[in-house]
Amino acid sequence: MLKKNIYKNKRFYKIINFPQVQLIHSGIFPENNYYNKENQILNKLRGKIPLEIKLKKEIEPKYGYQILDPAGIVTLTNFFEKGSLAMVKSGERNSSSTEFFFVTNKFPELDGRYSIFGKVVKGIEILQEIDKEDLIYEIIISN
C-alpha cells in the first residue's frame, strides 16, 4: 500500500488528547470505498489485518490474541512508547485495515491491544505539532 502512495495527501482526521499523551489518527476509512482506478489498489477493505503481538518467550508472533489482563503485559516485547505507530481497529480484535495512529508518549493502557508496527525515530517533535486536517506528503520507511 505504501509503494502505491495510497496515503499521499490523506489527512490526519482525528487527534485525541489525554493529559499525558495524544493519539494522532490517519489513513483511509474502509467504508469510504476508496478505489484507485489506475492501480486498483483497494476496494472496500474490511478487517483484513489481524491483531498481532509478540511475547517474550515465543518465537513467532501471536495473531488474533489480545492481552486483557494487566499482569500479562509484562510478557510483551513491544510497548506503546513515544512515537509508536499502530493499526486502528474497531471493537473486534482482527478488524484493522488501512487506518493507523501514532502516540506522542508512553501509553501502557494500549499495550497488548493494538498491533504496533513502527516507530518515529527521527523528527518526533514534528509528530507533536500535527494538527487535525494536516496532510501526509511522504512516508519513508527505514530499517
List each language-model region with its residue ranges.
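Cross-family detector of peptidyl-prolyl cis-trans isomerase
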Residues: 1-143
